[in-house]
From Swiss-Prot:
Organism: Mus musculus (Mouse)
Region feature Laminin-binding, mapped onto this chain: 161-180, 205-229, 242-295
Higher taxonomy: Eukaryota, Metazoa, Chordata, Craniata, Vertebrata
Gene Ontology CC entries for this record: cytoplasm; cytosol; cytosolic small ribosomal subunit; glutamatergic synapse; membrane; nucleus; plasma membrane; postsynapse
Cross-link position per record: Glycyl lysine isopeptide (Lys-Gly) (interchain with G-Cter in SUMO2): K89
Protein name (record): Small ribosomal subunit protein uS2
Amino acid sequence: MSGALDVLQMKEEDVLKFLAAGTHLGGTNLDFQMEQYIYKRKSDGIYIINLKRTWEKLLLAARAIVAIENPADVSVISSRNTGQRAVLKFAAATGATPIAGRFTPGTFTNQIQAAFREPRLLVVTDPRADHQPLTEASYVNLPTIALCNTDSPLRYVDIAIPCNNKGAHSVGLMWWMLAREVLRMRGTISREHPWEVMPDLYFYRDPEEIEKEEQAAAEKAVTKEEFQGEWTAPAPEFTAAQPEVADWSEGVQVPSVPIQQFPTEDWSAQPATEDWSAAPTAQATEWVGATTEWS
């Protein structure tokens, strides 16, 4: 598909990105129409997709998108969570119309609906999950592009891009590659320089993981503030408190005099000691006298 042009050939960096994201890994099932895109089959039953065919169909899809004069006439759809963020980023980069989440039936066929649209091109993430927009596109003669896995049905799909459409990294990378090629063919960005947008922005992130990362970052910030307060704040305080230490040492001598006089005078004159000593002596004499009477 790229012909003899070296500019359109797949670079080594692109191959490494595909392999790192697992784009070449298909499923254990194979549709008969996807056999032409299969390279080999692993011992565990997983089919390996030919990345050369993936790159050729990616360029063909980019050419079809660029051929649309108004970018808003291109509808990009993803009902699965793994592709919703990528679809929104693709639409922001290329000017397409995104539909992330549930697709309202009748959007392409029911003119009474408030959300009725008449796009000129449709791009979906998964033909199996996005079967409703593909079916409606067939009613209105709408050309379609789809990211297809080894077991994806190709009914109503005009341009199938073979890839792994189950993994979050693979789906995000494919939408990133497609957006980059569209911008390159339009002349918005140059092929000589790398695109400043990273593929990580197109990856799906679990909300729970985002909350955990935010909590960890907040805890780290609190600990940093505590350490900075312990090591930096006391330095000026010690220098300012030095003259106060001399004042406290001088003031200790004043309350020492009444503390010594108060307990010594109270406890010195106590007649209680004489009373307690006299009481047992009197009792002793009485008991002695009693014993003499019995005798």
